[in-house]
Amino acid sequence: MAARWSEKNPDLKGAALEDAMQKEPWDPSVKGLTSVPQVLAMMSDKLDWTQQLGEAFLAQPDDIQNAIQVLRARADEAGNLKSNKEQNVRRVAATPSPGYAGPPEYIVIEPVEPDYVYVPVYDPVVVYGADYWPPAYVPFFWYPRWWTVGPVIGFGAAAFVGPALWYHYNWGNRGYAAVQTNTALYSRFNRVNVTGGGQFQN
């Protein structure tokens, strides 16, 4: 439903999008995704994948997060993960956490401009290699209408997400708080009163 709404309202952004979201009964996480319609469209087109990913994250969050780092490392080793005008790629040291054994450092990917996100489009077999997936989980290559054959990793137009993405992933301290929440941005987009002074909260 949200994906169809987004397709019908492609020009709504910023404050206008915030206002429109107040009329919809969706979960705040769904409302936030309307700022990145390309991601929302892929999740809608591949509902079985979206459900499986959600269930896997609920049951095995550490395994999912480790898998992300393994794939980023593979892309980096193949020369397919680099900083550019859309994103910054850097490594951060991990904070030791009781009861959790993770890698000593993490690969972090951040937008060059904090309020804008460029959603990457790529063939996972090309970026990660032809043997990275288990036989039971053959990868798929989802691409938007504008996609044409070009660089290994392509990017669409910038999506303004300043007020909509209120979560920040804390890779360096996963054992204690994987996700931090910016209460001011959450409150602004969802018109609710959450204390916290506008800072990222654990």
Language model regions located:
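Mature extracellular/secreted ectodomains of secretory-pathway proteins
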Residues: 1-99
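Low-complexity, repeat-rich tail regions
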Residues: 60-202
